């Protein structure tokens, strides 16, 4: 009785090894794909931004990576659609950042309602 069990254990171990190898391969392919996309994005940004503007974007990325990612995507989309002149200077990037900041500002109002607690 124990012989079939050990055989099944060996099959199970082999199956687990194969699954782990497949998962590792999938993760490696995904990592390569992301690296390639990031490289393409950096290449596009080198074309559409002046060195000073790229430096400002890099500084933003250090402090607010999610915001910088969104900004990069927006800049690329604007440049590819022809809605913004290329290359974008540091001053133009500052103006874009100010516009985004104004759009994102929200007025918070606190209303205090008096209730009679009995």
Swiss-Prot record:
Record-level Gene Ontology MF annotations: DNA binding
Domain of life (superkingdom): Archaea
InterPro entries: DNA_bind_arc, PDCD5-like, PDCD5-like_sf
Disulfide bond positions: none
GO cellular component: cytosol
SUPFAM superfamilies in the record: Double-stranded DNA-binding domain
Any one Pfam family match given in the protein's UniProt record, by short name: dsDNA_bind
Keyword DNA-binding: yes
Sorted UniProt keywords: DNA-binding
Keyword field contains DNA-binding: yes
HAMAP family: dsDNA_bind
Annotated family: Belongs to the PDCD5 family.
Name this protein carries in UniProt: DNA-binding protein YN1551_1057
Source organism: Saccharolobus islandicus (strain Y.N.15.51 / Yellowstone #2) (Sulfolobus islandicus)
